[in-house]
């Protein structure tokens, strides 16, 4: 009898495993959104790093689903959903953004709606570009992570450092910001939080002088390929583990 119950449990678990869909949410600003290559004759950046990352991850696991309220990417990109919002700062991801005649909600709307298993987060560049109380940006980032964890306590959060620009002064501020949020991630990890550091700034080795940027802030197609490589190296190990966790959740 016990053996029969055990086999039945394994059968049900395997059935859920086979049906499980893993939801991945790219979350951030215009660098996540893509499409800011305006130079004539240069390859499009519509779809950002997702254009290269999505098919590579799908080749590992066909049950992945990229989610978000927005959709952008080239025709060949099978899954175009994301939460990349041009010009948005850290605090706006939490509270939303007020426009002249409208209001767009933030993660308090998106996360409950799409319930992602994995979140690919890169945010903070606009806080520095807009010189918006830069010293308080790491604290705002901590509040953002607290809110993400409250809204999606089972999600795995991969946090990418902000990438460089073509301005040395801005890069110094970006490096300081990255260092502080890295320390925060390490602190969270020591407490058992499911958040992980992706050192995009150093691992992608992007440079204006190498043709990795289209306008000094937004990556070129070449820059996005480098970003996709880094994301893939960090996300791939979580795909199968997240698949099993999702099957147990159903």
Residue ranges of predicted features:
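Active-site-proximal beta-strand/loop segments in catalytic clefts of secreted hydrolases
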Residues: 27-31, 67-72, 121-126, 160-165, ...
């Amino acid at each position: 009898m016990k053996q029969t119950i055990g086999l039945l449990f394994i059968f049900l678990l395997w059935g859920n495993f086979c049906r499980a869909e893993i939801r991945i949410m790219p979350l951030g600003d215009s660098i996540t959104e893509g499409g800011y290559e305006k130079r004539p004759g240069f390859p499009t950046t519509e779809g950002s790093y997702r254009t290269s990352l999505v098919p590579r991850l799908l080749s590992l696991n066909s049950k992945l689903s990229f989610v978000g309220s927005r959709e952008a990417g080239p025709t060949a990109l099978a899954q175009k959903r994301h939460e990349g919002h041009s010009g948005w700062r850290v605090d706006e991801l939490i509270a939303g953004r007020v426009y002249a005649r409208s209001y767009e909600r933030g993660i308090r709307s998106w996360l409950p709606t799409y319930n992602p298993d994995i979140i690919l987060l890169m945010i903070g560049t606009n806080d520095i570009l807009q010189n918006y109380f830069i010293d308080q940006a790491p604290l705002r980032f901590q509040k953002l992570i607290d809110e993400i964890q409250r809204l999606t306590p089972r999600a795995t959060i991969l946090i990418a450092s902000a990438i460089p620009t073509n301005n040395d002064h801005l890069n110094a501020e970006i490096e300081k910001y990255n260092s502080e949020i890295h320390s925060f991630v390490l602190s969270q990890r020591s407490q058992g939080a499911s958040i992980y550091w992706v050192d995009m700034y150093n691992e992608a080795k992007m440079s204006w002088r190498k043709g990795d940027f289209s306008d000094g802030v937004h990556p070129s197609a070449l820059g996005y390929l480098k970003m996709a490589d880094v994301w893939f190296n960090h996300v791939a190990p979580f795909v199968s583990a997240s698949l099993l966790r999702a099957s147990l959740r159903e």
